[in-house]
Amino acid sequence: MKPLSPLQQKLSKRTQALLNHPQGMGNYFTFKTAIDILGLDWADVAPGGVYAVTGKGYFDMGYMANHIGPSQAAVEALCQASADEDLVKVYPPDCMPELKALVAEHKFGRKLGKDFEVLGVEGAQGGIGYTYMTFLDPGDEVIVTDPGYFHFVPAAELCGAKVVPIELNAGNGFRLKPAEVRAAITPKTKMIVVCDPINPFGTVQTKDELLEIARLARDAGIIIFNNITHNTHQTDAKAVQIPMASLHSAEHDMSHVMSVSGVSKGYGMPALRVGFMAGHPELVRGAFLAKMELTKIHINYPGQHATLAAMKDEPYLERSTEIIRRNFAHLKETVAMNPGVSIPVEPSFGFCTVIDVAGTGVTAQEVTVGLLKHKIAAIPGDGLGDVKCADYLRLNYSSPDLACFETFRKALPLAIKEAQEGRYLDAVDAFFAKADTARGNGIRAQLAKRKRGVAAQ
């Protein structure tokens, strides 16, 4: 671990822990790392300082933006609200009453009432932060999946909590199994993170699994954080995704569930930063107070009006779902064409999936560099957890342009071949040497074996 500089020593202990965290921004490998390795011009690949690859000829299958974009109805509502001086000159509420009621039923499957409330926040990401801040104390334990969304682990640790991972694999169907959750619970467990659909696999929990996990948590006095932000698009036409809030009844009390969603994934509007937390008013009140004292930022009025229009636009949802199903079918065919590459589990909802490149004999990080060389941006697994961190690639298959998937079909075998030749070994190793995380050093050990093999050829 790198020693702290005198200035870094002034940071809080919580923040210092992120500097060398394997899931801290800049410490895990992404297509952005590949830009520098390849000596590309950032202005050509990601012009304007944007967070995604938008350069001409490039296709972004990395970060989870919905590349289909917003519905026309949402754009029109956004423009109208932005031009309304009466809206722009006043502070907005956290969430307009009409939107709050629609979100409660449309996203969480429950009506507003004395036992259920919705709070507007700055994107689903804001919901993650406020949920952790509201409920976690130093020493608490949080059950998460491995792999899982980048920020579930470091954000919890920033609050002083200890993360208890449950490995997702073929044995549990890449889902949380109640028996494994039960085994992970200790007297210190404060929260269980139920990301459903699960990022990065797109798998969904069954109703029975959700009810049993809810019962386990309820009996032990544990909060459930149910993140459902990927539940808008049904990749598998037969799949069913159930928001935990919708299971509330006299028999199955869900008052201990805090739910979070947003519009970035389902409605293609990440720039607007619109998200929602929902749960029992006594819990939501705590989140509201934390939010007010920390940021006091409510969702902007134009964004709220755009969201209201987007959620009412059912034809948009149908069209975008057709695109996503088409894209995954194409992606699946491509994977089948490449020996040593597999899809561990097919996604049910959302537009992210994982491919496993372990059978090719190279690391996902090397393949990431090769893919970008051939115009495809991707994310390898070391930012998602320890499990198969050098084998997994997470891919976004939401692009409306079929050329994206045709380009990927050409790029994947080329990227693998270049990686097998050892072209990117030293550069990937140098990245992890500089990051100096425990996970990265484990990947370096794999790379060292690869170097010996390449040298012997």
Annotate each PLM feature.
Residues 18-123, 130, 310-311, 419, ...:
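N-terminal small-domain helix-loop-helix segment of the aminotransferase-like
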Residues 83-216, 231-233, 238-251, 258, ...:
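Conserved core of the PLP fold type I
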Residues 159, 219-220, 374:
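Helix C-cap/helix->beta junction micro-motif
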Residues 248-286, 391:
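Active-site PLP attachment segment
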Residues 288-293, 310-332, 360-361:
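Structural signature of PLP-dependent enzymes
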Residues 304, 308, 323-332, 343-357:
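Conserved glycine-rich beta-strand-loop-beta hairpin in the small C-terminal domain of fold type I
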Residues 361-367, 403-407:
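Short, conserved charged micro-motifs
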Residues 373-377, 385-457:
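PLP-dependent enzyme catalytic core of the Aspartate aminotransferase-like
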